[in-house]
Structure formats: structure tokens, C-alpha cells
């Protein structure tokens, strides 16, 4: 009892299915940059609080920031990366630290 239906519109005889490929979202790295004023303990706190790193991983990233000038804290979709940058920047300013948090395409 299977019935096949054809959808007809006034302008065309038959609607056709159009195959579309969904692209995965572009990913962005959230980066913390070194400065001479933000304490190392504060950077570790930020990494634990906003990026869910454990103390060991947060310490490794903090040392990379200190010695190499910057380090990737996490990779996210654009909206999440923007939110992380805004949260870290706001938290840093509230605590009177000039910590620079940016995002760049992965």
C-alpha cells in the first residue's frame, strides 16, 4: 500500500531535492598574551576558571605564556571563543590586571 506522491507547484512540474553539504564551523584559538604586570597566579586562576584546566595543565600553559610570549588556552567555535575572550577581559579588568586575551583562526 505504498503511495508515491509528487509535489507540484504552479511554476514547475516537480520539486527536486537539492543536496546541500553542511560545513563544520570554523574554529578559533583563544590566546593569552604575556605582560609584565599580571601575576602568574592570576593567569593560572584564569586558566582554571574559564578554560577548565587542572592546576598542572594551567601551570604549563602559564609558563609557556611567560617564556614564549603567548599560548593557546583552548580552541572553540567563533561564538564561544568571543565569549571566552570577553569573560577573561572583563574578569582581568575587574581585578585591575592588563591581561590580554585574543582569538585567532585555528
From Swiss-Prot:
Source superkingdom: Bacteria
SUPFAM superfamilies tied to this protein: ClpS-like
Gene3D superfamilies for the chain: 3.30.1390.10
GO biological-process terms attached to the record: protein catabolic process; proteolysis
Classification via InterPro entries: ClpS, ClpS_core, Ribosomal_bL12_C/ClpS-like
HAMAP family for this protein: ClpS
Assembly behavior: Binds to the N-terminal domain of the chaperone ClpA.
Family: Belongs to the ClpS family.
Function: Involved in the modulation of the specificity of the ClpAP-mediated ATP-dependent protein degradation.
PANTHER family reported for this sequence: ATP-DEPENDENT CLP PROTEASE ADAPTER PROTEIN CLPS, ATP-DEPENDENT CLP PROTEASE ADAPTER PROTEIN CLPS1, CHLOROPLASTIC
Protein's name in the database: ATP-dependent Clp protease adapter protein ClpS
Amino acid at each position: 500500500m505504498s503511495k508515491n506522491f509528487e509535489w507540484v507547484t504552479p511554476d514547475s512540474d516537480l520539486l527536486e531535492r537539492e543536496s546541500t553539504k553542511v560545513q563544520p564551523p570554523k574554529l578559533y584559538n583563544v590566546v593569552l598574551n604575556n605582560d609584565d604586570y599580571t601575576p602568574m597566579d592570576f593567569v593560572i586562576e584564569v586558566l582554571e576558571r574559564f578554560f577548565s584546566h587542572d592546576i598542572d595543565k594551567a601551570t604549563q600553559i602559564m609558563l609557556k605564556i611567560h617564556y614564549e610570549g603567548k599560548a593557546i588556552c583552548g580552541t572553540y567555535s567563533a561564538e564561544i571563543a568571543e565569549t571566552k575572550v570577553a569573560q577573561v577581559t572583563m574578569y582581568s579588568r575587574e581585578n585591575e590586571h592588563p591581561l590580554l586575551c585574543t582569538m585567532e583562526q585555528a
